[in-house]
């Protein structure tokens, strides 16, 4: 009995202290070394020894992929400068907007069921320097590692599943909130500036714009004439800049009860950092305050800028309405965006809705008094989008659907 007790304690200690630092393949492992080092430089050498195995594996795999990405980075960059793909106003991207865990993944997957739309896949956003000329190598060496990256703990991941293009901006050189939120928690203040772009220097903003546009250009090469569908929660705070970069772009915003979003983001950040952080996390209260401020500021940016979007290029939906009547809401969205909606499109969307409906949903503990106070500060968002407290029970039942 005593030996069993000791064995149990050893396993519990390992789960608590060892597992978080195991060197899983990092989502930046297919980014070339120059992009990885651009992110790591911001840590100012603050890598606790417990994270060194994870750091070493990241640098090793990145070094291999640096060589693999060279042909595409040299050849395709020159090709795009000489013959950039044309993007007309009537074929500008469709952007899915909404804060993290508001239902953006569910909405993106529904839209991606439309054969006329093309979302980037996970290999494309995680290896933005390699996915055209280097696809054969990428498919052989990296795609089998996708299940090991632990991204699927927070979002559906697969070689052909729709992905967030902000991962591409991160893996092109840390131009994303993800670099702070998932990789360097102690440097969130620096990387969070790429969320709404307001505090960037002129050079930083120019670099972000050029990389965002270049990534869309590369996607256009492999889209086969289809309209691009892009989803990243950070785009919610970038509407003004996206309209400048992509005239004629269309936007669909999804909202959810602020309490449910807040709860789910606590889980999201914890799991991201558990899998990918190279530094110790911030104290819980400090991280929750960052989430609260960021969530409120993101949606306020959107509310301030949505009047700039032409009426025919803009639609909004609430997650609970999309769950209750997916086809009714999708048909309404298509009408408001003036996009064609086919019978085949409806059948594929119904399959997506059924798949997401069967997914396991997370349960979260009750809020503390401090967390309740933070949720109360988000009440303006519930009023703005009609996500009143009366629907919180429904949102808890829906769980974490993106």
Residue ranges and their predicted role:
Residues 2-70, 194-198, 203-209, 216, ...:
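PAPS-dependent sulfotransferases, especially Golgi type II membrane carbohydrate sulfotransferases
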Residues 74-96, 125-129, 134-137:
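N-terminal signal-anchor transmembrane helix
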Residues 96-112:
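Glycine-rich phosphate-binding P-loop
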Residues 97-99, 229-233, 319:
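Short His-Asn-centered micro-motif
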Residues 113-123:
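Post-Walker A helix-loop "phosphate-sensing" segment adjacent to the P-loop in P-loop NTPases
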Residues 125-228:
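PAPS-dependent sulfation machinery
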Residues 231-232, 242-267:
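Conserved phosphate-donor/acceptor-positioning beta-strand/loop module used by diverse small-molecule
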Residues 236-239, 259-262, 323-326:
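Flexible loop/turn segments at secondary-structure boundaries
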């Amino acid at each position: 009995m005593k030996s069993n007790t000791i064995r149990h304690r050893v396993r519990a200690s390992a789960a608590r202290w060892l597992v978080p630092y195991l060197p899983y393949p990092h989502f930046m492992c297919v980014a070339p070394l120059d992009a990885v080092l651009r992110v790591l430089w911001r840590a100012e050498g603050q890598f606790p020894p417990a994270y060194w195995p994870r750091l070493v594996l990241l640098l090793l795999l990145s070094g291999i992929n640096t060589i693999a990405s060279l042909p595409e980075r040299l050849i395709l960059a020159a090709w795009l400068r000489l013959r950039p793909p044309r993007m007309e106003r009537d074929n500008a991207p469709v952007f899915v907007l909404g804060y993290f865990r508001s239902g953006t993944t569910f909405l993106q997957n529904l839209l991606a069921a439309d054969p006329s739309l093309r979302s980037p896949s996970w290999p494309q956003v995680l290896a933005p320097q390699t996915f055209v000329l280097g696809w054969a190598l990428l498919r052989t060496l990296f795609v089998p590692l996708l299940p090991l990256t632990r991204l699927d703990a927070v979002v559906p991941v697969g070689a052909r599943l729709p992905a967030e293009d902000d991962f591409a901006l991160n893996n092109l050189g840390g131009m994303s909130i993800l670099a702070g939120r998932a990789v360097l928690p102690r440097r969130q203040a620096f990387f969070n500036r790429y969320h709404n772009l307001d505090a960037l220097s002129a050079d930083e903003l120019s670099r972000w714009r050029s990389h965002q546009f270049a990534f869309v250009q590369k996607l256009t090469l492999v889209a086969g004439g289809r309209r691009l569908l892009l989803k990243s929660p950070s785009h919610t705070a970038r509407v003004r800049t996206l309209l400048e970069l992509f005239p004629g772009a269309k936007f669909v915003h999804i909202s959810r009860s602020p309490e449910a979003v807040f709860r789910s983001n606590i889980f999201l950040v914890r799991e991201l950092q558990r899998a990918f952080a190279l530094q110790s996390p911030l104290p819980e209260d400090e991280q929750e305050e960052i989430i609260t401020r960021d969530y409120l500021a993101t949606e306020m940016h959107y509310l301030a800028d949505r009047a700039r979007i032409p009426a025919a290029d803009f639609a909004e939906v609430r997650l609970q309405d999309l769950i209750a009547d997916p086809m009714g809401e999708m048909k309404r969205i298509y009408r408001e965006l003036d996009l064609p909606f086919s019978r085949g499109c409806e059948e594929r969307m119904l399959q997506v809705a059924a798949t997401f409906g069967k997914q396991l949903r997370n349960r979260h503990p009750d809020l503390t008094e401090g967390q309740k106070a933070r949720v109360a500060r988000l009440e303006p968002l519930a009023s703005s989008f009609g996500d009143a407290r009366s629907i919180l029970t429904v949102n808890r039942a829906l769980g974490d659907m993106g």
